[in-house]
Amino acid sequence: MTAALANRREETFLHLAGELLVPLPEGGLWWPEQRLLVVSDLHLEKGSAYAARGQMLPPYDTGATLAVVERLSAQLMPQTIISLGDSFHDRAAELRLPEAYAERIRALTSAHDWIWVEGNHDPDPPAHLGGRAEKTVRLGPLVFRHEPEGEAGEVSGHLHPVAKVKGRGRNVRRRCFASDGARLVMPALGAFTGGLNVLDEAFGKVFPEGLTAFALGEGKVFVLSGGSLLGDVPRGAQWKL
């Protein structure tokens, strides 16, 4: 265990393409050997995007999301941070971004080698916020991109995975990492982001042999085998109009 993790709670580890990675309960991914922190699908300014269309959500999602990244940055002191696409909710997000939040982003990008991976929501990250843009990042046996393509060693986002299991008296639904040991899909870290159940057919295309879910808990990541997972629609059920 690295010094950066020494003061954290019990850690969960996963292996991907032979590399040891740490899925964090906040939703980030830590690669100790490279001092690399990965976060995905921040969707900054999603609240203001909805407000502009008349759906008045509290305008605090960007601040809450940045606070998580800032906390992980302070705890782990990464050399590099990769924001794995859909960092901003839309192309006009920078026009709605309060200057106080812009300053916090610039503080992060100036303190680290910050890489904005291009997403489907934000192909052109704002240049004035610092960092550098890449479509794909390759580092050792791992490749980082926004949308999964099924390549061995791939770390991607985009699908916003969630796992559902039976709890004590009720079902529990949590954001999660999804992996088969060869490829990994990150959870969405954004405060207002929803999620797609890992039993959805979209994940079957990425993990044809099945997957393990690493569910985010309070201060801990829980490993869930495929047999314990529940779908959002009971098996055999059909939608009725």
Model-derived features: positions:
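Extended recognition/assembly regions associated with phosphoester-bond processing machinery
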Residues: 1-241
